[in-house]
A protein has these predicted regions:
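Short amphipathic alpha-helix that is part of the acyltransferase structural core
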Residues: 1-39, 156-203
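Conserved acetyl-CoA-binding loop-helix of GNAT-fold acetyltransferases
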Residues: 94-108, 130, 268-273, 277-294, ...
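A structural microfeature
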Residues: 70, 74-75, 137-140, 237, ...
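Phosphate-binding active sites in nucleotide-utilizing proteins
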Residues: 199-209, 215-241
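Conserved donor-binding loop and adjoining core beta-sheet/short helix segment
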Residues: 6-11, 17, 21-109, 114, ...
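Acyl-donor-binding surface of acyltransferase catalytic domains
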Residues: 62, 68, 80-85, 90-174, ...
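Hydrophobic adenine-recognition pocket in adenosine-nucleotide-binding enzymes
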Residues: 88, 269-271, 304
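Active-site/acyl-donor-binding loops of N-acyltransferases
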Residues: 131-151, 286-334
Length: 334
């Protein structure tokens, strides 16, 4: 019922246009993106491949190339590295395109293939059950409104969240300062690997991956909060914030914002195991929320593993509530 179209990369203008059209339409209707950031980075680096799903009955062979792609494409996918991401445009759902495409892609799929269902879509759940995929990971997206009433409250006695991450601030036995590109890179990569040693994606981030993210339009070193031990100056924690389309700094409160809804993301937060259990995570969260408020954000969001009970408890205690759920499936051997 469907057929797979592929191109070497998204430098093919026609192919790229249709891929992004499908992804954008799905995001607009569903309320969440069909491909996560890591998948898009992998695609950009060439380590994974983009595919288009076309309706087989359109007769691609008899049509011109542009006409074929424009009129036949009903879905898109990203494959490679043992992972699969697939989306069908809303107007073409319920017609069997996802099932047909999945069956074709599973023919040569590696053992233990994983697939994400962003938004825990019922149709994806049904396909997972039908083709032998088990739920192996649940990721919660939580959100809260800003300004946040508790962002300047004292934490664990002398520790206090502070405003303006553009300059060094004291938080009891630690200081919080902005990330210094080209200086803090190696130390942060090492700490990130330690903190997320059991995390399949975040813990494997290299200096190259950090540089790729620092090159994104949204990156602002002032939104990358670094906690250091006051005595040793060792990096012991971080809270990296992300404001889409927001790399311009408001540090001096001299920027005007005409946006009615600006979402800031707690992109990744971590605390060195030796510093855990002393309130540093909460302090970094409060400092991050204050920073987002200063930057004009009206709400904050984050992603957290559902099984990370202590982290989920912290975020809920700060007023975060459920927004969406992402589920990762793994195909079990047959």
């Amino acid at each position: 019922m469907s057929r797979i179209l592929s191109a070497p990369d998204l430098k093919d203008a026609f192919f790229a246009g249709q891929f992004h059209r499908i992804a954008g339409t799905a995001a607009q209707v569903d309320g969440y993106r069909p491909f996560n950031e890591q998948a898009m980075f992998d695609l950009a680096s060439g380590s994974r491949t983009a595919l288009l799903i076309a309706a087989e009955d359109v007769g691609l062979g008899a049509m011109g190339r542009e006409e074929a792609i424009g009129g036949a494409v009903v879905g898109a996918a990203i494959v490679g590295l043992g992972e699969l991401d697939l989306v069908i445009q809303p107007a073409s759902r319920g017609l069997g395109h996802a099932r047909a495409a999945l069956e074709e892609m599973l023919v040569d799929a590696p053992a233990g293939l994983t697939a994400w269902s962003h938004g825990d879509h019922p149709a994806a759940r049904a396909l997972a059950n039908r083709y032998g995929f088990d739920n192996v990971r649940t990721l919660l997206q939580l959100c809260t409104a800003l300004p946040f009433a508790g962002t300047t409250a004292a934490v664990d006695g002398p520790e206090q969240a502070t405003s303006s991450a553009s300059q060094q601030t004291s938080t009891g036995p630690a200081t919080i300062e902005a990330f210094r590109p080209g200086i803090d890179d190696a130390e942060w990569v090492a700490l990130n690997a330690l903190v997320f040693a059991d995390h399949p994606e975040q813990g494997s981030l290299t200096a190259v991956g950090l540089a790729a993210r620092a090159a994104e339009p949204w990156f602002n070193p002032g939104d990358f909060l670094i906690a250091r031990d006051r005595a040793s100056l060792r990096m012991i924690g971080f809270n990296w914030l992300k404001i889409e389309g927001g790399s311009q700094s408001n540090d001096d409160n001299d920027s005007d914002s005409d946006s009615d809804d600006v979402i800031g993301e707690i992109y990744v937060i971590g605390v060195h195991p030796d510093a855990a259990g002393h309130g540093l995570g909460r302090t970094l969260m409060l400092a991050g929320l204050e920073r987002l408020r200063e930057r004009g954000c009206t709400s904050a969001e984050l992603y957290v593993e559902a099984e990370s009970a202590s982290a989920v408890h912290l975020y809920r205690s700060l007023g975060f509530i459920d927004r969406t759920i992402d589920v990762q499936y793994r195909r079990h051997p047959r």
